[in-house]
Structures are given as structure tokens and as C-alpha cells.
């Protein structure tokens, strides 16, 4: 245990009387009536069995235009049924079984999960599908993991935890909140389920949708912790999010495993990113990592082209680059190590990783509780909250411009984020204690 805990102990001791306090539970955020975009079609399985592929087909309805007036009907119109029948026929022709499907209107494609026989070679099937004129491409279903370094450690219920929040002590967010709170900025948290009834998260979720199995969204550790760091409510006795007035889009694309680890796959993540793009997300948080993935690659390209800030987590101890943090244009974030060591490389073509607090972070936990968490997942959440603060002040800034503000090339420290200096550069005056050159690296081209 590191030296952080003795400091925490003093604070938690004065909070012990809160341990038995009843917590008011509120209903999980419900989608507005009539909005089919918030009611995902249940998947056959959120964790596809082995021997499955994703097959992307050029099967849009005759009236469909990818960027025109998509209002949610595309997922359940009569054209979808006819497209699925054609996909079933294609599957039979190639000896496959259709398992699930989802429209990807931002790409102008339909995505199908197809299972192949145990004895078949996926490489051979993918090669055969590539020769079919209906097929845009086919790929394996990849797995992704949340970037938490250890299971959460419980904390006493207690903005009394604010004094031990790194965002409070080092980023001075209480001072920054006099200038910006991320008001009404939509932040898509693509993760495991978020506890929408938690007292620090009640009313913070504009959307709470389940792209894993289509059922009610369960309260899970990783997603709840990430959501709290980004946008926990201020002034109600728990923690304070970096952007407490941001509007969270809770998009469950990952699920909690028995060992409390977090797992996602290409299909569930693709559905959630597609939704975030279509429904006005201004920031997308991806506190996860896995292998390169063509579907997610294409979707991230669209998100970045539309000016959405995308944040990915990277493990500083990993042997190689991790996707999606190494996708060009994504803000790669690692946990801030002791001693201010150099940032890890996110990949050959990516920018150096940003460093943000990611060790012993107090945050929200399911069941109206709080816990301490560590890992680059939570460092990424800090940066997503920071982007929300910046977006309120400069809503038209591009992701590249925001990155230059976070990590100006002429700064003495090009590794650790200086939150006060960043906001001060946007405002052209000091927002809190800072010595930054406020005229350099602004929101210019």
C-alpha cells in the first residue's frame, strides 16, 4: 500500500458516521417514449461464442441515406427484415449461421454476426466472403478489456471525499468550476453498466442504453467508477466529477465478469459507437483496450471527422500499442506514474500519451457506495471530463485543437496535464494558480 492511504485515513475517519446513512434510490434513466434509437434490439449473446465472424454487408434500404434524417426507424423498418433474409441466404451459401445483426448507418452498412462450423478455418471463410460482391468486409469478433489495474477497494460513504481526489488536489477543479462545469456537454461512456440511481450520479445520465443484451442496464463496477470521475454531482456529500454538469450517455457495451474484470467485443462496441455518433456525443470515453479492429477503426474515423473528442486508455506497462488508444486522432491516456516519468508511446503514428491521475482514485461504486480504483481506465475518464470543460468554453474546437491546449508543444512539461493552465489558455486569463503563457497554443488552426 502506498503513502496515499495514510492521507486518506484521516479524511475517512471523519466520514465514518455516514456509513449507515440511508441512500435515496431513484429510477434508472428511461429512454423517451417513441425513441427506438434508445431501445437496442436484444442480441442473441453479449459474448459471442468462438467461431464467429462479423460480416459487413452493402445492404441499405433503397430509401436509406447514411447521413440524412436518421431518427431511429432504420433499426426496425420493414427494410431491415428483407435485408436480414438476404443475409441469411448469404450465410447458407457460405455454410454459416446468422446469429445477430445491427445497422451501422454512419457507415452505410449492416453488421451481421455469423457462426462458422468448428472444423472450418476462419481465414478461408473470410477470403471466400471477400469475393462476394455483397460483402464490404468480414473480420473476427475481437475481445477488449477494461483498463483497471486491480479490483476496487471499498471506501466509506462520504463531496467529503473531495479533499483526497487527485482532480481536486492537483487539477483544482473546484476553482475551474467557477469558469466551466461542462454544462450540457454530451459525454458517451462506452463501458459496462452505470448505477444511475447512485446519489452522485442521479440525474446525470441523459441516456442509459444497453447494447450488450437489450435488457435493463445493470449496475457494474467499471462503468460506474468511470462515470463518477467524469460527472459526479457536486455538493451532495460524495465526490465531485471533473465535469459535474456534463450529460452522460451511458452506453453499456461491456459486461462485468465473475472476477470483476470488464469485457467487451467488436460487435457491442460497434453498436455503441454508432449510437454515440448518431445521437450527438461531443466526447466519447473508451476506457478499454484490445487488438486492432477494422469496424471500430472505421467508426472512430467518422467520429473524429465529425469533431467528436475520443479518449482511449493505454497501459504504460503493456509490451505493445493498444487499440483504440493508438488510433490516429484518439487522445491516448495513461496513469500518471510517480516521479513524472516519460509518457508511453501510444503507437507508431499516434501522438505521445497524455498522463492523468489514475492511482487510488475515489469514485462511485454500485449500490450507492464509493471505492478507490486504479488504472489507466480512470486516467482516461479524467481527460474525458477535461474535454467536457473545454468544450463548454470552445464548443467548435476540433479534437486536434483541444489536444494542443492539453499538451502544448512549447510547454516545459509536455507529459502531465496542467488543468489550470489548459483552461487559462482558453480563457486568456488565469483560472486558478498557474504560470502558463496564456497567449501560446490557443484554439487557432
Regions found by a protein language model. Name each.
Residues 229-230, 251-253, 282, 358-422:
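Hydrolase catalytic cores
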Amino acid at each position: 500500500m502506498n503513502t496515499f492511504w495514510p492521507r486518506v485515513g484521516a479524511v475517512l475517519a471523519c466520514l465514518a458516521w455516514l456509513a449507515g446513512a440511508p441512500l435515496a434510490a431513484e429510477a434508472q434513466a428511461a429512454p423517451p417514449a417513441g425513441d427506438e434509437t434508445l431501445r437496442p434490439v436484444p442480441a442473441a449473446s453479449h459474448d459471442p461464442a468462438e467461431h464467429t465472424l462479423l460480416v459487413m454487408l452493402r445492404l441499405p434500404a433503397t430509401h436509406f441515406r447514411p447521413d440524412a434524417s436518421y431518427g431511429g426507424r432504420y433499426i426496425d423498418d420493414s427494410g431491415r427484415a428483407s435485408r436480414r433474409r438476404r443475409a441469411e441466404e448469404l450465410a447458407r451459401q457460405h455454410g454459416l449461421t446468422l446469429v445477430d445483426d445491427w445497422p451501422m448507418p454512419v457507415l452505410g452498412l449492416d453488421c451481421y454476426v455469423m457462426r462458422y462450423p468448428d472444423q472450418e478455418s476462419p481465414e478461408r471463410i473470410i477470403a471466400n466472403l471477400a469475393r462476394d460482391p455483397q460483402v464490404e468486409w468480414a473480420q473476427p469478433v475481437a475481445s477488449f478489456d477494461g483498463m483497471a489495474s486491480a479490483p476496487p477497494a471499498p471506501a466509506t460513504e462520504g463531496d467529503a471525499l473531495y479533499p483526497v481526489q487527485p482532480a481536486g488536489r492537483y487539477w483544482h477543479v473546484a476553482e475551474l468550476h467557477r469558469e466551466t462545469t461542462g454544462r450540457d456537454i454530451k459525454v458517451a461512456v462506452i463501458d459496462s453498466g452505470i448505477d444511475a440511481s447512485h446519489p452522485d450520479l442521479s440525474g446525470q445520465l441523459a441516456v442509459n442504453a444497453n447494447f450488450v443484451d437489450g435488457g435493463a442496464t445493470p449496475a457494474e463496477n467499471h462503468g460506474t467508477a468511470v462515470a463518477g470521475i467524469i460527472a459526479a454531482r457536486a455538493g451532495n456529500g460524495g465526490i465531485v466529477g471533473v465535469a459535474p454538469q456534463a450529460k452522460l450517455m451511458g452506453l453499456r457495451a461491456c459486461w462485468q465478469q465473475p472476477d470483476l474484470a470488464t469485457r467487451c467485443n467488436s460487435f457491442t462496441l460497434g453498436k455503441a459507437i454508432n449510437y454515440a455518433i448518431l445521437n450527438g456525443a461531443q466526447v466519447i470515453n473508451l476506457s478499454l483496450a484490445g487488438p486492432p479492429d477494422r469496424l471500430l477503426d472505421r467508426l472512430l474515423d467518422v467520429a473524429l471527422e465529425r469533431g467528436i473528442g475520443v479518449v482511449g486508455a493505454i497501459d504504460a506497462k503493456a509490451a505493445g500499442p493498444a487499440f483504440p488508444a493508438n488510433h490516429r486522432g484518439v487522445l491516448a491516456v495513461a496513469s500518471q506514474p510517480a516521479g513524472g516519468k516519460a509518457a508511453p508511446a501510444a503507437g507508431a503514428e499516434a501522438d505521445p500519451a497524455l498522463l492523468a491521475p489514475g492511482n487510488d482514485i475515489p469514485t462511485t461504486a454500485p449500490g450507492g457506495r464509493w471505492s478507490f480504483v486504479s488504472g489507466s481506465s480512470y486516467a482516461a475518464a479524467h481527460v474525458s471530463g477535461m474535454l467536457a470543460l473545454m468544450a463548454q468554453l470552445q464548443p467548435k474546437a476540433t479534437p486536434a485543437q483541444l489536444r494542443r491546449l492539453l499538451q502544448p508543444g512549447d510547454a516545459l512539461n509536455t507529459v502531465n496535464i496542467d488543468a489550470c493552465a489548459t483552461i487559462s489558455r482558453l480563457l486568456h486569463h488565469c483560472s486558478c494558480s498557474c504560470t502558463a503563457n496564456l497567449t501560446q497554443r490557443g484554439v487557432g488552426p
